[in-house]
């Protein structure tokens, strides 16, 4: 009796520079991360049907990722054909072959067989983003400028932090989200913090760290855009409180440009818990 699985679920850990992509999601006639990866998979995985990717975070146009995660199901027969003459195992061979055909602005950092029940989107417990800003009109280092927003006004870290504290917690973020049919806008925003770095790759940049269980469409950039208006003195805390409590998306909130934003990390529970987490997440979020 053949007990081999019909498909093998594979986890891909990815990084990409989003500058020249129209976002993650496949779109006709546009260069997207998903479309580029799936085209590479079609070349590497010789299967009758094209493997489809499920991703942890569907990044918008221009948004980058250092720690993106996706999964796909590969037919078992095609999976067994992957090892090369260099005697790599299937996962190592898949990553190496993909990186050989992918453009320079995407890299597969690792490929691995996913634990039972793993879902890149629904098993995740947290996403962490960073938004990088060079304020007061100062030009950022040319080596990082594609990932940094040049902001014309000076920012006050104390004002940014005070404004952000009022937004964290489990709440309805409809004022900061582009509505999608049947999708909830209730999220648990665990951190929205700001710091001015003094050393390292981000030296002299203002960096926002944003963590939540998940984010709805344009939520991170809307949060950043709203808080920036307080941090540069154009708005006050009362204004932010009013727009945050709006029952629908507020036109008063300027969405921050995509190129300053990077998906840094996606967090998952232990292998034994990923299936349970996926089942829980598929249930609609409520405030109860």
What role is predicted for each listed range?
Residues 2-288:
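Structured-RNA-binding interfaces characteristic of tRNA pseudouridine synthases
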């Amino acid at each position: 009796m053949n007990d081999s699985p019909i498909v093998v679920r594979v986890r891909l850990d990815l990084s990409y520079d989003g500058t020249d992509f129209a976002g993650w999601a496949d779109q006709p006639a546009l260069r997207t991360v998903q479309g580029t990866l799936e085209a590479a998979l079609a070349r590497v995985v010789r299967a009758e049907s094209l493997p489809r990717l499920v991703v942890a975070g569907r990044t918008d146009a221009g948004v980058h990722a250092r720690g993106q995660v996706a999964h796909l199901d590969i037919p078992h027969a095609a999976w067994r054909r992957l090892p090369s003459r260099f005697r790599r195992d299937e996962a190592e061979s898949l990553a190496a072959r993909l990186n050989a055909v992918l453009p320079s602005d995407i890299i597969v950092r690792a490929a691995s067989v996913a634990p039972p029940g793993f879902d890149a989107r629904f098993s995740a417990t947290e996403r962490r983003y960073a938004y990088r800003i060079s304020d007061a009109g100062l030009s950022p280092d040319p080596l990082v400028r594609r990932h940094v927003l040049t902001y014309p006004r000076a920012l006050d870290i104390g004002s940014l932090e005070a404004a952000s504290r009022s937004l964290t917690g489990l709440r309805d973020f409809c004022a900061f989200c582009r509505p999608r049919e049947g999708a909830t806008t209730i999220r648990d925003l665990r951190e929205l913090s700001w710091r001015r770095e003094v050393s390292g790759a981000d030296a002299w940049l203002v960096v926002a760290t944003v963590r939540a269980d998940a984010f709805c469409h344009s939520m991170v950039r809307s949060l950043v855009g709203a808080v920036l208006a307080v941090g540069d003195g154009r708005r006050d805390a009362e204004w932010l409180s009013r727009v945050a409590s709006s029952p629908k998306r507020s036109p008063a909130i300027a969405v921050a440009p995509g190129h300053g934003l990077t998906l840094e990390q996606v967090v998952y529970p232990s292998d034994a818990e990923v299936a349970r987490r996926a089942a829980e997440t598929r249930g609609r979020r409520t405030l109860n």
